[in-house]
Structures are given as structure tokens and as C-alpha cells.
Regions:
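A short, hydrophobic beta-strand element within the central beta-sheet of small alpha/beta folds
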Residues: 95-108, 119
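Conserved phosphotransfer microenvironments
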Residues: 73-90
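Conserved phosphotransfer cores of two-component systems
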Residues: 64-66, 89-96
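Acidic, metal-coordinating helix/loop segments flanking the phosphotransfer/catalytic sites
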Residues: 52-70
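Short beta-strand/turn micro-motifs composed of small residues
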Residues: 30, 73, 101-105
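Conserved acidic residues
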Residues: 69, 116-117
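Non-catalytic signal-transmission and effector/linker regions of two-component phosphorelay proteins
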Residues: 1-33, 40, 108, 117, ...
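Two-component/phosphorelay signaling modules centered on CheY-like receiver
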Residues: 32-51
Length: 139
């Protein structure tokens, strides 16, 4: 799914690329409207640009258009799509993008399984602080 884009589309930021990394932007990937609203509210309140994708395919298209500074991925998407998306991402051109996962599960091993910090719904306590820390050097 996260294969290189066709030659007619811009490629993700690489040395010599004209496509810039939008350092204070976030791509939120979730199919849950409540989680989407909460993530949007948190990110916008802290002054971050945010784009949302409701599926792995939509997220891949957005990644090829604009490289975000951070991905927020809902692991509880239908068909475990969030987990699959993060695993695929880690093996693609986008593996260097910072990722944070959100889930309703309280399994402490999820962070290890997805190689990303995991925050728990519904409150997502501490997520806004973590996002602020991730972007602190570039702001």
C-alpha cells in the first residue's frame, strides 16, 4: 500500500527533493468519528496543522502529497487496519516519520508491537504533552 508514488506525483521529502516536510503538521488516521474529533480538537488547540484519513489507503495518498511531522494512528480501526498500517509504514519510504498510536486496549506490549508510543482512549491523557515534546525542537 505504501509503495513509491507514480512519477507524475511529487515524492516524499528526501535530499534534493522539492517536497518539504511540514514539521508542525499531523496526519491523524482513524475511522472513529469521536476519536477524529478529539484528535482534531487537541492538535488544533495546540496550533498544529492537522489532516485526517479514515483508512489506510487514504492515509497513503495524503502521505505522498504532504509529509507530516507526526502520524497519529488509531490501532482500533476496522480489521486491525491501524496496526497493519503502522507495520507497513515501518517498512516503507516513510519509516522515519514519528508515530503515536491510540487504542482502547490496555495491553502494555502494544508499544513494543507497533514500535511507537501508545496512548489510551477515551481521555488520551498525556497525548497533547507528548505531541508538544515531539515538535519542541522545530518550533
Amino acid at each position: 500500500m505504501l509503495s513509491p508514488p507514480p512519477p507524475t506525483e511529487p515524492r516524499p521529502a528526501q535530499s534534493g527533493s522539492v517536497m518539504a516536510v511540514v514539521s508542525a503538521s499531523i496526519l491523524a488516521v482513524t475511522d472513529d468519528p469521536e476519536v477524529k474529533d478529539l484528535l482534531l480538537e487537541m492538535a488544533l488547540a495546540d496550533g498544529f496543522g492537522v489532516r485526517c484519513a479514515a483508512s489506510e489507503a487514504e492515509a497513503a495518498k495524503l502521505l505522498h502529497r504532504e509529509r507530516p511531522g507526526l502520524l497519529l494512528v488509531d490501532l482500533d480501526m476496522a480489521g486491525r487496519a491501524g496496526m497493519k498500517f503502522l507495520r507497513t509504514l515501518r517498512q516503507s519510504l516513510f519509516r522515519d516519520i514519528a508515530c503515536v498510536a491510540v487504542t482502547a486496549s490496555n495491553d502494555p506490549m502494544l508499544s513494543v508491537a507497533v514500535d511507537a508510543p501508545v496512548f489510551y482512549k477515551p481521555g488520551l491523557d498525556g497525548l497533547d504533552t507528548a505531541i508538544g515534546r515531539l515538535f519542541a525542537p522545530s518550533r
